[in-house]
Amino acid sequence: MSQDTVEIRVEFGGGTELLLAPPHEKKHTLTIPRTDTAGNETNVSFLIGHIRKNLITEREELFVDGDSVRPGILVLINNGDWELEGEGDYVLQDGDEVVFISTLHGG
């Protein structure tokens, strides 16, 4: 692993995977820059932007709201609620797992 990048696992569930490019894979391994263009350490907010630009192909408004996720999407960082980790400010580390699960379902 390069010192300039971070390798993380990202998983989508509860329908969020349907927003991604076919074949709508639920699990992804991503290699992203360790710092953003301003030199700040890469955090979950950066990851959300990366997903928006590189993985989501349709209806991004169902996943993102500004620089965060929409209400109703549960975010887990290493199996813990992201609210306990500082939400979007959590600095990503090699080997982290970030899971996005929609808790909203039609019926």
Curated annotation (Swiss-Prot):
Cross-link (Glycyl lysine isopeptide (Gly-Lys) (interchain with K-? in acceptor proteins)), chain numbering: G107
Pathway(s) served: tRNA modification; 5-methoxycarbonylmethyl-2-thiouridine-tRNA biosynthesis
Signal sequence residues: none
Superkingdom of source: Eukaryota
Keyword Transcription: no
UniProt entry keywords in alphabetical sequence: Cytoplasm, Isopeptide bond, tRNA processing, Ubl conjugation pathway
Positions bearing 1-thioglycine: G107
Subcellular location: Cytoplasm
Pfam family, one: Urm1
One GO BP: tRNA thio-modification
GO cellular component: cytosol; nucleus
Post-translational modification: C-terminal thiocarboxylation occurs in 2 steps, it is first acyl-adenylated (-COAMP) via the hesA/moeB/thiF part of UBA4, then thiocarboxylated (-COSH) via the rhodanese domain of UBA4.
An example molecular function term from Gene Ontology annotations: protein tag activity
InterPro entries: Beta-grasp_dom_sf, Mopterin_synth/thiamin_S_b, Urm1
Similarity annotation: Belongs to the URM1 family.
Function recorded in the entry: Acts as a sulfur carrier required for 2-thiolation of mcm(5)S(2)U at tRNA wobble positions of cytosolic tRNA(Lys), tRNA(Glu) and tRNA(Gln). Serves as sulfur donor in tRNA 2-thiolation reaction by being thiocarboxylated (-COSH) at its C-terminus by the MOCS3 homolog UBA4. The sulfur is then transferred to tRNA to form 2-thiolation of mcm(5)S(2)U. Prior mcm(5) tRNA modification by the elongator complex is required for 2-thiolation. Also acts as a ubiquitin-like protein (UBL) that is covalently conjugated via an isopeptide bond to lysine residues of target proteins such as AHP1.
Name of the protein in question: Ubiquitin-related modifier 1
Taxonomic lineage: Eukaryota, Fungi, Dikarya, Basidiomycota, Ustilaginomycotina
